[in-house]
């Protein structure tokens, strides 16, 4: 059986920009992407902690060290600059792969700097 499991999470990032006139997507600082192994053009699910919106888009790599989290195109209507978001990817794994799978989680501070990396296992609580 194949199951869809969380693969990576950027936890509590702050939206730094919103660009309605760009052709869709989310731009994320390349350093953050590398830390959690998210690739450009990869599909992501986004949860806005401020308003409860949940949506999907794809990733564009942003400038390294910028802390940039910019929602582009239609998705920009679902956020405000300063909103706290969770950005996740999923992977389809078989039962054997699941036994050895540990999602990468980057916990962010208010400036979108990684303050903790968690290789998530069962029952991990991230506040």
From Swiss-Prot:
Question: Where does the record place the catalytic residues?
Answer: 25 (schiff-base intermediate with substrate), 58 (proton donor)
Tell me which residues bind substrate: 57, 73-75
Q: Where in the cell is it found?
A: Cytoplasm
Kindly give the InterPro entries that the UniProt entry links to this protein.
Answer: Asp_de-COase-like_dom_sf, Asp_decarbox
Keyword annotations from UniProtKB, A to Z: Autocatalytic cleavage, Cytoplasm, Decarboxylase, Lyase, Pantothenate biosynthesis, Pyruvate, Schiff base, Zymogen
Any GO BP annotation:
pantothenate biosynthetic process
Catalytic activity, reaction form:
L-aspartate + H(+) = beta-alanine + CO2
Modified-residue entries (Pyruvic acid (Ser)), positions: 25
Identify which cofactors the protein needs according to its UniProt entry: pyruvate
| Source taxon at top rank | Bacteria
The annotation note on the cofactor reads: Binds 1 pyruvoyl group covalently per subunit.
EC number from the UniProt entry: 4.1.1.11
Free-text description of this protein's post-translational modifications in UniProt:
Is synthesized initially as an inactive proenzyme, which is activated by self-cleavage at a specific serine bond to produce a beta-subunit with a hydroxyl group at its C-terminus and an alpha-subunit with a pyruvoyl group at its N-terminus.
Q: What does this protein do?
A: Catalyzes the pyruvoyl-dependent decarboxylation of aspartate to produce beta-alanine.
Q: Which PANTHER family match?
A: ASPARTATE 1-DECARBOXYLASE
Summary of subunit composition and partner proteins: Heterooctamer of four alpha and four beta subunits.
What name does the UniProt record give this protein?
Aspartate 1-decarboxylase
Please give the organism: Staphylococcus aureus (strain bovine RF122 / ET3-1)
């Amino acid at each position: 059986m194949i199951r869809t499991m969380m693969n990576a999470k950027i936890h509590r990032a702050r939206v730094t920009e919103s660009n309605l006139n760009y052709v869709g997507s989310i731009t994320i600082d390349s350093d953050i992407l590398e830390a959690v192994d998210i690739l450009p053009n990869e599909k992501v699910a986004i949860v806005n902690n401020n308003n409860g919106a949940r949506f999907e888009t794809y990733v564009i790599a942003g400038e390294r060290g910028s802390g940039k989290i910019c929602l582009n195109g239609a998705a920009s209507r679902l956020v405000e600059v300063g909103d706290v978001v969770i950005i996740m990817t999923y992977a389809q794994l078989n039962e054997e792969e699941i036994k050895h799978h540990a999602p990468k989680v980057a916990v962010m501070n208010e400036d979108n700097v990684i303050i903790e990396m968690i290789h998530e296992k069962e029952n991990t609580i991230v506040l």
